[in-house]
A protein has these predicted regions:
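Structural preference for beta-rich elements and adjacent junctions enriched in aromatics
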Residues: 1-157
Length: 157
């Protein structure tokens, strides 16, 4: 089931990923719980995830906050298997023709973007596009193995 979230426009100049948390705080943009759990039978574990977003007319500002029992980010480079890591996912459909963008980013900011009408056969964004997306993670940007113990981390794009 698709959820719709209105994304507020804020008056701000270009924002770096490292400043997104502060900018969204100053604009009083609150977090919204992510309560859509895909593939629940196959993957019953469900971390707590919240997201908040805004735009300035040129940039979409995204801030995830995740609490989970173990954090992992081993995908070594963009366009890798980030879905096997602690990962945040966003589906955007800017036009009503059935196509959508799927953005997946792990806890270290490693990114995968696909575009298409269904899960299979989506066209992946080239590295030249991925390089234009600034990223910040409270876990740092270097891949890492499992870190056990409940913790909360944030990711900004």
């Amino acid at each position: 089931m698709a959820n719709t979230l209105e994304i507020k426009k804020i008056s701000t100049a270009s924002v770096s990923a490292a400043d997104i948390c502060r900018v969204l705080d100053e604009a009083n943009i609150g977090f919204v719980a992510v309560d859509n759990h895909c593939w629940a039978e196959a993957f019953p574990y469900r971390p707590t995830m919240e997201v908040r977003m805004a735009h300035n007319g040129k940039q979409l500002l995204i801030n995830y906050r995740v609490t989970e029992e173990c954090v992992r980010a081993v995908a070594p480079h963009d366009d890798g298997n980030v879905w096997e890591d602690s990962c945040c996912e966003l589906f955007l459909s800017p036009v009503a023709d059935g196509t959508y963008y799927n953005l997946e980013c792990n806890a270290a900011g490693t990114l995968l973007i696909g575009f298409g009408a269904k899960r299979e056969g989506r066209e992946r964004a080239p590295q030249s596009v991925l390089d234009k997306i600034d990223r910040w993670s409270s876990m740092g940007r270097t891949p890492f193995s499992d870190i056990a113990g409940e913790r909360t981390w944030q990711l900004c794009l």
